[in-house]
Amino acid sequence: MRDFTHFNEQGRAKMVDISEKSITERTAVAKSSVEVNKEIYEKIIGGKIRKGDVLAVAQIAGVMAAKNTSQWIPMCHPLSLTGVDISFEWEETRNHYLLHIEASVKTTGRTGVEMEALTAASATALTVYDMCKAIDKGMVIGPTYLVKKTGGVHGDFERSSSQKS
């Protein structure tokens, strides 16, 4: 278990001590998606979902989730985020409506924001599902994945085009 930083000498979980790490700018981008039927797509676009503006509420949920990631993920450090942005893009093909979600997170600190970006993308997708499930419970969420991250000891990461979903 030597290779895992989240275990102590007894093999039990611990939160990693980051006090000696350098303060640097850290960024991360994660993506998710929600596949919906035509009725849901048209109602979201037309502002006809009874619970309200789906994309506005989902966007706020994503920002809130990023800010509260350490409450959800046990070994995540509480971070002071300097920016969170949630964006949407529709992909429409014949009888196929896919809402692409991108969550970008930024901080200046001692640890990265990958989990915050992934949590934001996930919570955004879950909120879309929650607000539309009365119409169709067959929506499909995902895949959810890290696109890129910058900063830190381990350097930058960018998912290759062959790894992209």
From Swiss-Prot:
Protein name as annotated:
Cyclic pyranopterin monophosphate synthase
Give the similarity note: Belongs to the MoaC family.
Please name the PANTHER family in this protein's record: CYCLIC PYRANOPTERIN MONOPHOSPHATE SYNTHASE, MOLYBDOPTERIN COFACTOR SYNTHESIS PROTEIN A
Among SUPFAM superfamilies, the record links this protein to: Molybdenum cofactor biosynthesis protein C, MoaC (SSF55040)
Q: How does it assemble?
A: Homohexamer; trimer of dimers.
Q: Give the matching CDD domains.
A: MoaC_PE (cd01420)
Catalytic activity, EC = 4.6.1.17
The keyword Lyase belongs to this UniProt entry's keyword annotation: yes
Function of this protein? Answer: Catalyzes the conversion of (8S)-3',8-cyclo-7,8-dihydroguanosine 5'-triphosphate to cyclic pyranopterin monophosphate (cPMP).
